Amino acid sequence: MNLLEKSDQEIIDIANPIWENLVKSSNIKDYGGFTKDFSSQMLYGANEVELGKQWANNKLLTSLSEKQEFLGCIRRAQFITVLYKQTSNTIPGEFLGRLVLGVEDGQVKVFGATIY
């Protein structure tokens, strides 16, 4: 699968369910659900204890709105970064969500996920 050749709409169709799952799983602190689409590289750095600390220390990560707005795609090397405008159910303001997708063993996987 050549992810880089896909249109923005095709990328959105792939990325949105992954992002929605990350938001839902983060809100309920579900480690298994949160990491289910992670690449092996991401899994290595996202152990359950570390994620638990992030969820405990950052209210934003457990209060994300299920509504987001797609902002665009950035294609670089073998990865596509998908950008979202994200809000929180409890924290005022708008946040930038970043989802880095790539292909591992023929499947689209998460190689990065952050929110600022």
Question: What is each residue range found by the language model?
Answer:
Residues M1-I28:
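Short, low-complexity N-terminal intrinsically disordered segments enriched in polar/charged residues
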Residues S26, D30, K59-T62:
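Short amphipathic alpha-helical segments enriched in hydrophobics
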Residues N27-Q41:
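Short, well-ordered alpha-helical segments enriched in acidic and aromatic residues
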Residues S40-N58:
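A solvent-exposed, acidic/Ser-Thr-rich amphipathic alpha-helical stretch
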Residues K53-V103, G112-Y116:
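Surface-exposed, charged secondary-structure patches
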Residues D105-Q107:
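Structural motif
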